[in-house]
Amino acid sequence: MVGVGFAQRPGAVAEVKGEIFGNIIDSIGGEAIPYATVMALNPLDDKMVAGAVTKENGSFSLANLPLGTYKLKISTIGYTTKFVENVVLSETSLTYNLKDFRIYQKTLDIVEIDGKAPEITYEIDKKVVNVEDQINTDGMSAVEILRNVPSVSVGADGSITLRGSAGFTLLIDGIPTIMDASDALASIPASNIKNIEIITNPSAKFDAEGTSGVINIITKKSKLEGISCLVNLSAGRFNNYSGDVALNFKKNNFIFDISGQMSNRSRPSETTTERTTTYDSLVNRLVSVGDNDWSRSSRGFGGGIQWNPNNSHVFQLNTDIKWNQMLPYSDFRFSEYVDDSLVSEFSNFQNNNIDMFNNTSSLYYQYNIKRNINHNVSFKAIYNNSDVVQNDTTLSYNQDGGIRAGNLYTETGPSGSWRFNVDYKLPLKKDRKFEAGLQAQFGSSGDIGKNYTYNSVTETFDFNPLFSSDVEYVRDIHAGYTMFSGKYKSLGYQLGLRAEYTFQTISTTAATEYLTIDQLDWFPSAHFSYSLKNKSQLLVSYSRRIERPRSYFFEPFITWDDPYNVRTGNPNLLAEYINAFEVSFMKPFKSKGFASVEVYARQSNNIINRISSVYEPGILITQPYNIGVAQSIGLEGSLSYDIKKYWKINAGANAFYFILNGNLNGVDYGRESFNYSARLTNTFTFKGYMLQFVSAYESGSVTAQGESLGSFSQDISLKKSFMKNKLAVTLMGRNILGTERSGSTSFTENVFIETLSKPFAPQIMLSVALKFNNYQKVADRNEQMDDF
């Protein structure tokens, strides 16, 4: 509020009037403060003479004021009330400009909010999942968080799919990462995540990349003045541990952030594989049993600065540096049978060492035209750099310990990209908005692959030039988009069109010819929302998307997984094109929760599948191919409900019918399956404790050459908070019943393979989280609760 007061009674010069105007902004970020109350008070008795409420851009005007001296009072929920004394309107100064007046968020007399934010909020083009109120996240990574997110499935091996597809785009605070999505998510501490945006049908403003959409990780940011700190430590079974710290300093119009983290993630499994090969009447059976793991360690730090000199300008500079090491290994014992008679036994050991350095830096500038935060132009520059050193060693041993065969593969190479964006927003009348933008992206990478074969005579590895090659990749993507959105009564709409130009070349020293891609594609999008009674919503959307193959899909190298399996890339892969439709309905139950139902359909053309074929007698080679068209038609539902004050449930289910129409080299790969998954979370609160049970089941699915198995898991968490929720201790158990598994069956010509992998269980983790200042929700004791 703003108020004005007089040293003398106004009205001495009745025919002359004055005006007090200006704009109110946040003291930290410089954002406009809408709906703040501005009062002009008489300083003699503090009675109100005039009042106004700030607009969306924070501006206000108190016009037709009698000349005199006023006292201004500015107040709004969540901010400290401010007064401005001796504001004078006179014949020589008829106006008073309160330009960029800063008010401060409250830091004193704060109490913790008892209520929790909704688990999921629905916007016209996305679902926003609240993460910071989940109790089973301490000490975990973003991968574990996604296990409890609707539409997302995480396999026992850590693989991530969005509505059954592994093709999605990962953003971190809106910035794409050059790392593989699973690797990037494994390096993000769950305690640093505020929200996760699930965008299954992205608008034209987003990159068109991603079969099933976009997952955007929104990290926590402090909101009050001074220094804030968040510290997390955790340790558990199977050599799992982590630690991270985040510091935030805010003063006036500057914000500084710095963070550091280290972690080691390991989830060993026991795997059994049975491979049956039929030669006329002869049956050869190869059985392998052993342990395997894909452990990851991560070290990194990041920092950022934001400067808001006034309500017109915003500057941000951020950088994030990580060192990741992946150490996948397998140790299997093989038994070979011919017509059920044991003919040989040996062991196979594979040890990989992948060292990766990654740096992501970004610069952002936004100019608010006429100090209107809804009318702006922004510029963003992003630099991504990654350097990888990989060593894969495969050794096969006889029973006496002697090496019977071996292979060594090394790969080195940097990759990098530059990305530049310019975006413009223009508010129009009647709740309408126009947006447009341009993007330029330049990407390149190089791989030097060398293959070595074990020499039993010299007991060294000999270089094999036949399976070695240098590869250079160049992929540039330039884009432009335009969007128009608005609202008419209860109907909201958003229409967009995006154009993307792709230029891609691949060169190699191997005798391989690659396609050059030089083409322009169009990607329309349409989103509609309709507000019904009782705050229910109906959402309808459509988008066209593209899934470009990753660079390693083109690799000409031959990589040995074991003595009987090799893999390589395909130089002639084409991009997948996807059409996606959705209809969603969301109904809230007042303060009890909500329910939602979504119907969706997706068609992917040029679908990419990995196909196995005979490489040499007894050896299979796996390559990616475009084999045809895939269709999915599904139904997804979510329910969140407070059964009792101390008991809350969160349930979700997804079911879809999958049809694959594929053909390659005259072989029919057509398959169909009905897939489904379900998740149930029960949360109990009692005497300062929170107890949570998470049960999940995912059915199997078909592939071009087989099918995967279903899996059930059960997690449990117990959390206790101390020191007014500044200190929290969480004990969590994952897969406590030991029922989680991953497995598959596949068939290739005369070869049938069954694989079953079960992770070691249970996985136990103890975590401690310590918060200073305001890494929590706060509200004033004397005002309405407000999650700001």
State what each model feature region is:
Residues 100, 142-145, 160, 183-184, ...:
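N-terminal periplasmic accessory domains that precede
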Residues 9-12, 25, 29, 37-41, ...:
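Short, acidic, small-residue-rich periplasmic hinge/interaction motif at the N-terminus
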Residues 208-215, 223-274, 296-299:
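Outer-membrane beta-barrel translocator/receptor signature
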